[in-house]
Amino acid sequence: MTMQIELKEISIRELTDRYQDNAENGVTAYHGELDVRPPYQREFVYGEKERNAVIHTVEQGFPLNVMYWATRDNGTFEIIDGQQRTISICQYVKSEFAYEMRYFHNLSGDEKDKILDYKLMVYICTGTDSEKLKWFETINIAGKPLFKQELRNAVYSGSWVSDAKRYFSKSSCPAYAIGADYLTGSPIRQDYLET
């Protein structure tokens, strides 16, 4: 099967519908049908500067980089590229952080609608798992660079990697609690998993 790619406009209102970030069960959005952090994705690594740049782009009505989603066999979606931007947008709309000292819930109705009606350009990709993983590796050469372990996790995903990430790739993971004084690097960039 050759990967099929279709361009679709999705509003931030649609994207943030049923957004949920659950440390153990993952991150979902888009009516609960989008897996924002599939097994091959890294943890959220954007800092304040990057998050604010995303919100500034949306607020100004400038075009945001294209995102890539993949369809699953059950009709739901998973993010191939755009996880960091998606989480930044969802966190802002859910008032989890302020942009220019204003939380989303403090904006006027018109300001909220302008953001919620903003259209994101999303390529929906349909193909085999190996095609999707290859596409993930190909399109992730820009942006915040992936570390070698993050790329390995994209190529070698599965239940073992998912379990290992739970224990070694979160700031609240058991490995961090036990080894923080002895290990260098960042658990969310998967340095502990690589060790």
Question: What are these regions, as identified by a protein language model?
Answer:
Residues T2-D17, Y40-T195:
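Basic- and aromatic-enriched surface patches that contact anionic nucleotides/nucleic acids
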Residues E14-V27:
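C-terminal active-site-capping segments
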